[in-house]
């Protein structure tokens, strides 16, 4: 019986000119997802996925590294321009945006989409350290 050769499908490079970078920056982590204009994910990265543990995940440097990794996957797919949406109060917001620009992507717009409650749920009690 003839042996089947191990053939693997090659990843098809999508040629997407522009997209949206969603930066979710919390107090504990920063997640960067790059999508096309419809919202289909092209690449993502986070501080935790890059090996940062504990309180190091919430640093601006970790956010910068996460944005660089996500930008590389976007550039591989032919992306040149980005809209940036930022959500959350974390430390890595500005660092992630600067890192996307430094990676060679042109940022056309920056939008803050942090959800603000109209006096909804009661916030957690204050920490006493």
Curated annotation (Swiss-Prot):
Family: Belongs to the universal ribosomal protein uS11 family.
rRNA-binding in keyword set: yes
Gene3D superfamilies associated with the record: Ribosomal protein S11
GO molecular function annotations of the record: rRNA binding; structural constituent of ribosome
InterPro entries, alphabetized: Ribosomal_uS11 (IPR001971), Ribosomal_uS11_bac-type (IPR019981), Ribosomal_uS11_CS (IPR018102), Ribosomal_uS11_sf (IPR036967)
Entry protein name: Small ribosomal subunit protein uS11
GO biological process, one term: translation
Record-linked HAMAP family: Ribosomal_uS11 (MF_01310)
KW Disulfide bond (keyword) present: no
Subunit structure: Part of the 30S ribosomal subunit. Interacts with proteins S7 and S18. Binds to IF-3.
One Pfam family in the UniProt entry: Ribosomal_S11
Biological role stated in the UniProt entry: Located on the platform of the 30S subunit, it bridges several disparate RNA helices of the 16S rRNA. Forms part of the Shine-Dalgarno cleft in the 70S ribosome.
One GO cellular component term noted in the UniProt record for this chain: ribosome
Keywords: Ribonucleoprotein, Ribosomal protein, RNA-binding, rRNA-binding
Annotated organism of origin: Oceanobacillus iheyensis (strain DSM 14371 / CIP 107618 / JCM 11309 / KCTC 3954 / HTE831)
Family annotation (PROSITE patterns): RIBOSOMAL_S11
